[in-house]
From Swiss-Prot:
One of its GO terms (molecular function) is hexosyltransferase activity. This is Uncharacterized glycosyltransferase MJ1057. Its EC number is 2.4.-.-. Keywords: Glycosyltransferase, Transferase. Belongs to the glycosyltransferase 2 family.
Length: 290
């Protein structure tokens, strides 16, 4: 571990592996240039062979002593990497950022003030801009505030939370941690366990994050990703089922994911490719229509 840290108000946690240099620099700079200055920025490099990323992080660290750098000796995965940062995080709150996303300048200031003024809130999110590889805004993500007050109902009905927009009480993340056995969906699993523990969610109805959507993968990669996503959704739900026995929305997501997973496993690849092509064409037509 490299760097020093007093007790800041907020610790920012970032895990990086092989994100493009441009994205990594933009992400680091977005934290260093926050209007709120009292924070520590813990960056974990999960690829010990990525010498360029190490060089970039150390260059920023020389200019900003708030940056704490950890290099894993081997690839541990995002969950374990984030947990290493969480273990040394200090202060009342932890903010998450991924190494290809951008925190808008007042993110930490506004989230910290909101948490301080609403002490009953445990996890706080924000509105998000979805951006492309060049930083162009693709979509605005604006979930309604009232849905966070009924999180047990709406969390399983629709997409409400974007992980790198989260600020959470340190004691909660240190207690629950990310499940390191999950390759995917560690954030989803963490949120389900927070809901099971009756922690309170909320959202600031302001845009405080730019969330990067990568270029569209080829169809084989997309099939693999959807298969993995469905599998780990099933695994996460099954693991936490005792807390949601009577939650009909929880079980709807479970059975929907089961159907999707079985469909992908049992359907010939060439048919899946045809269905993906049809979906892409519909998306193009819809986009042109707007």
């Amino acid at each position: 571990m490299v760097g020093e840290m007093d007790k800041p108000l907020v610790s920012v946690v970032m895990a990086t592996y092989n994100e493009p240099e441009k994205y990594l620099k933009e992400s680091i700079e977005s934290i260093x240039n926050q209007t709120x200055k009292d924070f520590x920025f813990i960056i974990v490099l999960d690829n010990p062979n990525n010498k360029k990323a190490e060089e970039i992080i150390k260059e920023y660290q020389q200019k900003d002593k708030r940056i704490i750098f950890i290099k894993n000796e081997r690839n541990l995965g995002r969950g374990a990497s984030r947990n290493k940062a969480v273990n040394i995080a200090r202060g009342k709150y932890i903010a998450i950022l991924d190494a290809d996303d951008i925190a808008l300048p007042k993110r930490l200031e506004k989230q910290f003030k909101y948490m301080e003024n609403n002490r009953d809130i445990d996890l706080l999110f924000s509105w998000v801009y979805f951006i492309d590889e060049n930083g162009n805004i693709l979509k605005e993500f604006k979930p309604e505030k009232y849905k966070f007050k009924e999180i047990k109902k709406y969390f399983f009905k629709e997409h409400l939370t974007v992980h790198p927009s989260m600020m959470v009480k340190s004691k909660i993340l240190k207690k629950l941690k990310y499940d390191e056995k999950l390759i995917r969906s560690q954030d989803y699993d963490f949120w389900i366990r927070c809901i099971a523990n009756d922690y309170k969610f909320d959202i600031i109805e302001e845009f405080l994050l730019k969330y990067r959507i990568p270029n569209r993968d080829n169809y084989l990669s997309r099939i693999k990703k959807q298969k993995l996503y469905s599998y780990y959704t099933l695994k996460t739900h099954w693991k936490n089922k005792k807390h949601f026995c009577n939650n009909v929305y929880f079980w709807k997501v479970f059975f929907y994911s089961l159907v999707v997973y079985l469909f992908i496993v049992l359907t010939p690849t060439f048919i899946l490719k045809i269905l993906i092509d049809i979906k892409d064409k519909k998306t193009e037509i819809s986009t042109k229509g707007h």
